[in-house]
Amino acid sequence: MLKNNKEILSVLFDLDGTLADTSQDMCDSLNRILDLRNLKQVDCVNLRKYISRGAIGVIEYASVVNGKSIDSSLLRSEFLEDYKNNCFIKTTLNKDMDQLLDYLLSEQIKIGVVTNKHSRYVNKIIKGLGIEKDLSCVVTGDMVLNAKPASDSLMKAAEIIQCPT
Protein backbone atom coordinates (compact mmCIF):
# COMPACT_ATOMS: atom_id res chain seq x y z
CA MET A 1 0.00 0.00 0.00
CA LEU A 2 2.56 2.60 1.11
CA LYS A 3 5.84 2.46 -0.74
CA ASN A 4 8.38 4.25 1.43
CA ASN A 5 6.66 4.51 4.78
CA LYS A 6 9.75 4.69 7.00
CA GLU A 7 8.96 8.34 7.75
CA ILE A 8 5.31 7.79 8.68
CA LEU A 9 4.98 7.27 12.43
CA SER A 10 1.32 8.07 12.90
CA VAL A 11 -1.89 8.89 11.08
CA LEU A 12 -4.64 11.04 12.58
CA PHE A 13 -8.19 10.83 11.28
CA ASP A 14 -11.17 13.11 11.65
CA LEU A 15 -14.20 11.14 12.81
CA ASP A 16 -17.28 12.42 10.96
CA GLY A 17 -17.17 11.66 7.26
CA THR A 18 -13.52 10.55 7.23
CA LEU A 19 -13.12 7.59 9.56
CA ALA A 20 -16.82 6.87 9.99
CA ASP A 21 -20.15 7.71 8.43
CA THR A 22 -22.08 9.22 11.33
CA SER A 23 -24.50 11.15 9.15
CA GLN A 24 -27.50 8.81 9.33
CA ASP A 25 -27.60 8.79 13.13
CA MET A 26 -27.25 12.58 13.23
CA CYS A 27 -29.98 12.95 10.63
CA ASP A 28 -32.33 10.55 12.41
CA SER A 29 -31.88 12.42 15.70
CA LEU A 30 -32.54 15.76 14.04
CA ASN A 31 -35.62 14.45 12.25
CA ARG A 32 -37.07 13.01 15.47
CA ILE A 33 -36.78 16.44 17.10
CA LEU A 34 -38.21 18.19 14.05
CA ASP A 35 -41.17 15.77 14.10
CA LEU A 36 -41.85 16.56 17.75
CA ARG A 37 -42.08 20.24 16.79
CA ASN A 38 -44.24 19.58 13.71
CA LEU A 39 -41.46 20.78 11.41
CA LYS A 40 -40.41 19.34 8.06
CA GLN A 41 -37.77 16.63 8.17
CA VAL A 42 -34.44 17.16 6.43
CA ASP A 43 -33.02 15.04 3.64
CA CYS A 44 -30.17 12.96 5.05
CA VAL A 45 -28.06 13.11 1.89
CA ASN A 46 -28.23 16.91 1.74
CA LEU A 47 -27.56 17.17 5.46
CA ARG A 48 -24.08 15.64 5.03
CA LYS A 49 -22.55 18.91 3.85
CA TYR A 50 -23.68 20.65 7.07
CA ILE A 51 -22.49 18.01 9.54
CA SER A 52 -18.93 19.36 9.65
CA ARG A 53 -20.39 22.48 11.31
CA GLY A 54 -21.83 20.44 14.17
CA ALA A 55 -25.22 20.82 15.81
CA ILE A 56 -25.51 24.49 14.83
CA GLY A 57 -24.85 23.64 11.18
CA VAL A 58 -27.51 20.92 11.02
CA ILE A 59 -30.05 23.16 12.76
CA GLU A 60 -29.30 25.98 10.32
CA TYR A 61 -30.01 23.53 7.50
CA ALA A 62 -33.30 22.57 9.18
CA SER A 63 -34.20 26.28 9.25
CA VAL A 64 -33.56 26.52 5.51
CA VAL A 65 -35.65 23.41 4.81
CA ASN A 66 -38.48 24.79 6.92
CA GLY A 67 -38.23 28.29 5.45
CA LYS A 68 -38.10 29.93 8.85
CA SER A 69 -35.76 30.62 11.70
CA ILE A 70 -35.77 27.89 14.33
CA ASP A 71 -34.83 28.58 17.96
CA SER A 72 -31.42 26.98 17.75
CA SER A 73 -30.63 27.03 21.48
CA LEU A 74 -33.66 24.92 22.45
CA LEU A 75 -33.52 22.68 19.40
CA ARG A 76 -29.77 22.19 19.85
CA SER A 77 -30.13 20.85 23.40
CA GLU A 78 -32.99 18.55 22.36
CA PHE A 79 -31.04 17.33 19.33
CA LEU A 80 -27.88 16.66 21.35
CA GLU A 81 -29.82 14.79 24.03
CA ASP A 82 -31.45 12.57 21.41
CA TYR A 83 -28.15 12.07 19.60
CA LYS A 84 -26.41 11.10 22.86
CA ASN A 85 -28.80 8.16 23.17
CA ASN A 86 -28.72 7.26 19.46
CA CYS A 87 -25.23 8.10 18.20
CA PHE A 88 -24.35 4.51 17.35
CA ILE A 89 -27.36 2.95 15.64
CA LYS A 90 -26.43 3.19 11.95
CA THR A 91 -22.90 4.61 12.20
CA THR A 92 -20.27 2.53 10.39
CA LEU A 93 -16.65 2.76 9.39
CA ASN A 94 -16.36 4.29 5.94
CA LYS A 95 -15.75 1.98 3.00
CA ASP A 96 -12.43 0.09 3.20
CA MET A 97 -11.43 1.97 6.35
CA ASP A 98 -11.14 -1.30 8.29
CA GLN A 99 -8.56 -2.52 5.76
CA LEU A 100 -6.62 0.74 6.00
CA LEU A 101 -6.59 0.61 9.79
CA ASP A 102 -5.44 -3.03 9.74
CA TYR A 103 -2.67 -2.13 7.32
CA LEU A 104 -1.47 0.82 9.39
CA LEU A 105 -1.43 -1.32 12.51
CA SER A 106 0.48 -4.08 10.71
CA GLU A 107 3.11 -1.46 9.82
CA GLN A 108 3.21 -0.34 13.48
CA ILE A 109 1.94 3.10 12.54
CA LYS A 110 0.06 4.76 15.39
CA ILE A 111 -3.55 5.70 14.70
CA GLY A 112 -5.48 8.51 16.32
CA VAL A 113 -8.79 10.33 16.04
CA VAL A 114 -9.04 14.11 16.23
CA THR A 115 -12.55 15.54 16.17
CA ASN A 116 -14.53 18.56 17.28
CA LYS A 117 -17.30 16.25 18.48
CA HIS A 118 -17.78 15.98 22.26
CA SER A 119 -16.34 12.96 24.08
CA ARG A 120 -19.80 11.85 25.30
CA TYR A 121 -20.59 10.87 21.69
CA VAL A 122 -17.12 9.95 20.48
CA ASN A 123 -16.48 7.38 23.20
CA LYS A 124 -19.71 5.52 22.35
CA ILE A 125 -18.95 5.63 18.62
CA ILE A 126 -15.33 4.46 18.96
CA LYS A 127 -16.42 1.61 21.23
CA GLY A 128 -19.27 0.69 18.89
CA LEU A 129 -16.92 0.60 15.92
CA GLY A 130 -14.71 -1.78 17.90
CA ILE A 131 -11.54 0.22 17.35
CA GLU A 132 -10.87 1.65 20.82
CA LYS A 133 -7.93 -0.71 21.41
CA ASP A 134 -6.40 0.17 18.03
CA LEU A 135 -6.18 3.89 18.73
CA SER A 136 -3.13 5.51 20.28
CA CYS A 137 -5.13 8.65 21.01
CA VAL A 138 -8.57 10.20 20.77
CA VAL A 139 -8.80 13.98 21.04
CA THR A 140 -12.29 15.43 21.24
CA GLY A 141 -13.61 18.97 21.05
CA ASP A 142 -14.10 19.23 24.81
CA MET A 143 -10.43 18.39 25.45
CA VAL A 144 -9.03 21.57 23.89
CA LEU A 145 -9.58 25.30 24.20
CA ASN A 146 -9.82 25.99 20.46
CA ALA A 147 -11.61 23.59 18.11
CA LYS A 148 -10.44 22.74 14.61
CA PRO A 149 -9.46 24.32 12.32
CA ALA A 150 -7.22 25.70 15.09
CA SER A 151 -4.24 23.42 15.65
CA ASP A 152 -4.84 22.78 19.38
CA SER A 153 -6.33 19.31 18.94
CA LEU A 154 -3.67 18.18 16.47
CA MET A 155 -0.91 19.40 18.77
CA LYS A 156 -2.52 17.60 21.71
CA ALA A 157 -2.73 14.39 19.67
CA ALA A 158 0.93 14.71 18.66
CA GLU A 159 1.86 15.13 22.31
CA ILE A 160 -0.19 12.11 23.41
CA ILE A 161 1.31 9.78 20.81
CA GLN A 162 4.76 11.32 21.28
CA CYS A 163 5.06 12.30 17.66
CA PRO A 164 7.72 14.88 16.83
CA THR A 165 6.10 18.12 15.67
What are these regions (language model features)?
Residues 108-112, 165:
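Short active-site oxyanion
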